[in-house]
């Protein structure tokens, strides 16, 4: 009897549960596993893997800790435990939605306005992007996404929704900026294959490039989606992490400008209804564990649908009340944004200087984010300028230099040899160790080339 039970087939699961569309086999996630199995610690494991594949902001966490020490009432349930424990509005507490709208305005220098009634809260940007994909597209439809793009989009946009991603190929010759020709080519190819394209998703500032989109590029994308009856999702989760010129131009700013310039004309309102902004506190505030994301739409029907669907991705009332108190303190919010930008600028400069000493070039014009897009194409060698060659190099970096960096192919970059290197999720001392290791690895590689 026992033997028969042990030899019986496994119970079947759903197609979604067994699908490979999650993307967990990507080198992006494989690098995380290498770190998890052998994590670096300066005392207990100094030869371990240093995690440079995680875009996490730890450079300003002391400012948040200081605020909490000075304002313990912000996180103390106290007499408010009943209010926190009972049911609240699914799409977010009014006080927190108001605080989030104000903070989103602050980090954009007041150049865009956000209505708290259009703020829908989600458990992070992952949930926000998936929720919008569910709302805007049906299974089998597609979104255009410029490359290179955040590897998690393969999971966030495709896995549970059944929606496809059509990459918009951008190249280094244009600084990986989105061009009208690239958008048109991707769209035409998808339509020719019988795919209905429902929208364009961009990240601004870009992950993994660490650059902001030019105003003209954004204007062109707005006109493109209007011309082809599509939507635009602008993922702006790094909007408060712009540390150098040029300043961020948010798509929300352009919507406001067009409305003012055209006095509520039908074409300006038509474009506004196609625009949806995603934001999160995971990057700018460094609070990924709090799971706070935002869907902001100028489309009433999208806001209504997002509110209905947000019941699957709620933010706890305690989290909302704590952050509402913090972000409602306008003086603190403004001071934090300034200090965080200064610190990211210094950290970015240190990372770039160390990479250059190691013989690694970085993408020019980078001015935002928690990472550097680095050019290691010269390390691929003759005949190795392929995805396979890039992955062989990546495996060596992980195994020999004990550094987890993200290969460009995991970001769907069509030019092998580019990598994303994160710099804000570790101490300065650990960053220096990582850069030294990379320099030693490259010297070893150069020695091998000389000997061959």
UniProtKB/Swiss-Prot annotation:
The modification N6-(pyridoxal phosphate)lysine is found at residue 283. It holds the Pfam family Aminotran_1_2. Its cofactor is pyridoxal 5'-phosphate. GO terms for biological process: amino acid metabolic process; ethylene biosynthetic process. The keyword Zinc-finger does not apply. Its EC number is 4.4.1.14. Pathway: Alkene biosynthesis; ethylene biosynthesis via S-adenosyl-L-methionine; ethylene from S-adenosyl-L-methionine: step 1/2. Belongs to the class-I pyridoxal-phosphate-dependent aminotransferase family. This is 1-aminocyclopropane-1-carboxylate synthase 3. The gene is ACS3.
